[in-house]
């Protein structure tokens, strides 16, 4: 075979390369992370936790505040991190660029050589009472990040109860009390091409309406369409919840935004529908499902973080204590395939 026939033409090479790159980023976006909460007694040391992430091939972590021990343990681990700015810091960081610069210097820049920061999440499920501080705090953190020469996206995490009129999902919109401060945030995220983080819990939808929501719809085990929406069909509650937020974004000028599911999971005891078996079913089905997107965003993997690594016995009410994939002794509560 001649050389001219044995080698692909430059246009073909470019096409093949673009397909490989697209496949890589789609796979990367679909990798599963796990949230590392610390509100529990007798939890393992941060170094042991990071070792457990690596042992289980968990490549992404969410950390709810700048814990020095955890950040130090993450050095050199190659685990990508969502680092939260606690909501209690919003007013201080919104009122002072100097304070925001200091926060980024101490908690991000100091670890830049060894920790892979993926997102800085400013505020978790911010309530309307402090929502007026959110945009300015995000802008000040963004200024500090860019001023330090860091390439880290800045976002915020919302709960799905910020939306209403969610059935069918295409009717979803933001509640008025959230819309007033979220719409400027949505505009900011769009201008920076940053995703919106969403804590998405089919369990809570099921828990609040067991008379009308069947367990199989929440666990990804329904055998047929449950919710028909013009142009879309829903066989699981996760997709319906997610797409209702996408619909709300479209109504608020954020149709270009991607959503990162920054929390989701299923408790093993403490309330209706909780069991080890249900949690195992939900989590393992979730991991497979998010590879393929949702009806409103088909074919694009959904970056997703499972809540949580461990049970946290300092939380209330009772069902909030039992979301962990692992016991404090690092033994798995049930089998999960992270691959």
Curated annotation (Swiss-Prot):
EC number: 3.2.1.39
GO biological process, one term: systemic acquired resistance
Upregulating conditions: By 2,6-dichloroisonicotinic acid (INA) and salicylic acid (possibly an endogenous signal for acquired resistance). Strongly induced by infection with the bacterial pathogen P.syringae pv. tomato DC3000. Induced by infection with avirulent and virulent strains of P.syringae pv. maculicola. Induced by infection with the turnip vein clearing virus (TVCV) and cucumber mosaic virus (CMV).
Catalysed reactions, semicolon-separated: Hydrolysis of (1->3)-beta-D-glucosidic linkages in (1->3)-beta-D-glucans
GO CC term (a single one): secretory vesicle
PROSITE patterns: GLYCOSYL_HYDROL_F17
Alphabetical keyword list: Apoplast, Cell wall, Endoplasmic reticulum, Glycosidase, Hydrolase, Pathogenesis-related protein, Plant defense, Secreted, Signal
Cleavable signal peptide: 1-30
MF annotations from Gene Ontology: cellulase activity; glucan endo-1,3-beta-D-glucosidase activity; glucan exo-1,3-beta-glucosidase activity
Enzyme class, UniProt record, top EC level: hydrolase
Family: Belongs to the glycosyl hydrolase 17 family.
Described function: Implicated in the defense of plants against pathogens. Not involved in plasmodesmal callose degradation and in the gating of plasmodesmata during tobamovirus infection.
Name assigned to this protein: Glucan endo-1,3-beta-glucosidase, acidic isoform
Species whose genome carries this gene: Arabidopsis thaliana (Mouse-ear cress)
Source lineage: Eukaryota, Viridiplantae, Streptophyta, Embryophyta, Tracheophyta
